[in-house]
Regions:
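A conserved helix-loop-strand patch within extracytoplasmic ligand-binding domains
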Residues: 114-138
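Cofactor-cradling patches in redox/metallo enzymes
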Residues: 32-118, 144-159, 163-258
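Short, flexible active-site loops
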Residues: 133-144, 182, 279-282
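Single conserved hydrophobic/aromatic residue that forms the stacking wall/gate
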Residues: 1-9
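A short, charged/proline- and glycine-enriched loop
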Residues: 20-28, 131-137
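Ribonuclease/tRNase effector modules and their secretory precursors
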Residues: 243, 247-358
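Active-site and ligand/interface coordination hotspots across diverse enzymes
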Residues: 11-20
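Conserved beta-strand segments that form the floor/walls of ligand-binding pockets within enzyme
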Residues: 8, 26, 138, 341
Length: 358
């Protein structure tokens, strides 16, 4: 949870629409949308700015659900206070949420005025590029929408307006099962989360349409064609399943592009004079163990300064480590002409003590 929260903080952004100091609305797409389908976030925000009156601000970041699920209620309070301050600067606008869990969290934690982007699009009309799939689809209702009949109905109306044929499944609406992401199940018990995802997919062989980006990501990883409704509404098929590092990169790149293209602000990204490459095994291992490329690159940066590493005679690899926060990260790599090739990475909650003078 802590890693997720830290990434969301670093990738956060809050700006009023150009030409406004305060706004009638603020678009809050949710952290998973920016990580998985950043182009959808951009298209949706620009569309809202064009077709609504009174100004639409943009807020990228965490709604507080992650810390709430982790039982870190003191952190949730900090998130709430930060959100309240940012909203006050914008004139306490109505929040347009792109995620039902965000919508639920923001309503309950802040007592804020919140609506779903699906409600706004129902009111102002479909975007010009909206297009449904030509084959029957199944709807997966998000956990955050349980008890929210209005949201459930609106999603179905929008799909019908796009010409989608919806297949009824045995369990839907309030009985729709969790995809395995809710409550951070995928981080606490991966095997259980995988079983939950498989159970969801047993209901139909059709492509799944969701309105929660985390659900869409879980289903795609299991090999099922799945789209977030905003992908259909804005004619974008992200068609990917980014690993943990790619999700972080997508959020950072989204922030950088939006600042540059909409607010004419340059975000200075750190550049290195060497390259870090990864084997496919290393990438798979890092995603499984939730190790970011930025973690590995910080370890290698420390190695460049201290030149501390163990040489493995058998594999001809160098092994180095650094403690980041409360975790020690280990990297096995070889040096190349351009920089480094990472072959393995792992981590432990441990501290390596050095004896002075040895």
């Amino acid at each position: 949870y802590r890693r997720q929260r830290q990434m969301c903080i670093r990738d956060s952004l809050c700006r009023p629409q150009p030409g406004y100091e305060t706004c009638r609305y603020v678009f809050f797409p949710g952290c998973q949308a920016g990580a998985i389908a950043p182009d959808v976030v951009t298209e949706a925000y620009e569309d809202l700015c064009r077709r609504t009156e009174g100004g639409v601000a943009l807020m990228l970041g965490c709604c507080g659900a992650i810390s709430e699920w982790a039982g870190r209620y003191e952190m949730t309070e900090k998130v709430n206070e930060q959100l309240k301050q940012e909203l006050a600067k914008l004139g306490d606008p109505m929040i347009i949420a792109g995620c039902p869990s965000c919508m639920k969290q923001l309503k309950e934690s802040l007592g804020a005025k919140v609506t779903g982007i699906w409600e706004i699009l129902k009111e102002i009309g479909l975007p010009g590029q909206a297009k449904g799939l030509e084959i029957p689809v199944a709807i997966h209702d998000a956990c955050g929408a349980r008890g929210d009949t209005q949201t459930q109905d609106t999603i179905r109306e929008l799909l019908a307006d796009m010409g989608c044929t919806v297949v009824n499944t045995e369990y839907s609406r309030d009985l729709s099962p969790c995809c395995g992401y809710g409550g951070l199940t995928a981080y606490a018990n991966k095997e259980m989360a995988d079983k939950m995802t498989e159970k969801c997919l047993e209901r139909s062989d059709s492509p799944y349409i969701t309105y929660c980006m985390a659900c869409r990501d879980r289903f795609v990883r299991e090999g099922r064609e799945s789209r977030h409704i905003l992908e259909l509404l804005y004619g974008i098929n992200a068609a990917n399943m980014p690993d943990i590092s790619e999700k972080r990169y997508n959020r950072l790149e989204l922030k950088e592009k939006l600042l540059k293209n909409i607010w004419n602000e340059e975000l200075m990204m750190e550049k290195k004079d060497y390259t870090v490459a990864y084997t496919e095994d290393a990438i798979s291992m890092m995603d499984e163990r939730m190790i970011l490329k930025s973690d590995v690159e910080r370890v290698l940066s420390d190695y460049r300064e201290n030149q501390e590493a163990i040489f493995d005679e058998e594999t001809k690899e160098l092994v180095t480590r650094s403690r980041l926060g409360n975790v020690t990260f280990w990297v096995r790599f070889v040096e190349t002409e351009e920089g480094y090739l990472v072959r393995r990475a792992y981590s432990h909650r441990m501290n390596i003590m050095k004896r002075v003078g040895q």
